[in-house]
């Protein structure tokens, strides 16, 4: 199993928020979804897998206010049938999962 964690610094932070520990975020929050998709895309760019991996479900999301904002997002991902070297580009959201493929965290 893999743990895919996303740590992103976001510069624009309101001064009214206190810095410190991790705060749980709603996994259905639109910002969390966008950041998880971004992390999944970066993972696919850097992995040596022959096929794309697709995010299936966000399991947990947390944020921490420091000099910017850090995010820790854990999600399940599974391999798809879409090959990275295929000349007929298919957007990742249209790629079906491999049958009986194990989900990775």
Swiss-Prot record:
It is found in: Secreted. GO terms for cellular component: cytoplasm; extracellular space; vesicle. SUPFAM superfamilies: Cystatin/monellin. Keywords: Disulfide bond, Ion channel impairing toxin, Protease inhibitor, Secreted, Signal, Thiol protease inhibitor, Toxin. The keyword Transferase does not apply. GO terms for molecular function: cysteine-type endopeptidase inhibitor activity; ion channel regulator activity; toxin activity. Residues 1-23 form the signal peptide. It comes from the Eukaryota. CDD domains: CY (cd00042). The keyword Signal applies. Contains 2 disulfide bonds. Its main location: secreted. Pfam families: Cystatin. Belongs to the cystatin family. Inhibits various C1 cysteine proteases. This protein has no toxic activity and its function in the venom is unknown. It may play a role as a housekeeping or regulatory protein. This is U7-hexatoxin-Hi1a. It comes from Hadronyche infensa. The lineage of its organism: Eukaryota, Metazoa, Ecdysozoa, Arthropoda, Chelicerata.
């Amino acid at each position: 199993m893999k743990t895919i964690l996303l740590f992103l610094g976001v510069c624009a932070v309101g001064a009214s928020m206190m810095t410190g520990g991790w705060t749980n975020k709603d996994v259905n929050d639109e910002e969390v979804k966008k950041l998880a998709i971004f992390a999944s895309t970066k993972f696919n760019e850097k992995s040596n897998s022959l096929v794309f991996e697709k995010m299936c479900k966000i399991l947990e999301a947390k944020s921490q206010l420091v000099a910017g904002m850090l995010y820790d997002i854990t999600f399940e991902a599974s391999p798809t049938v879409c090959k990275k070297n295929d000349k007929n580009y298919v957007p990742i959201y249209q790629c079906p999962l491999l049958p009986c493929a194990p989900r990775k965290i």
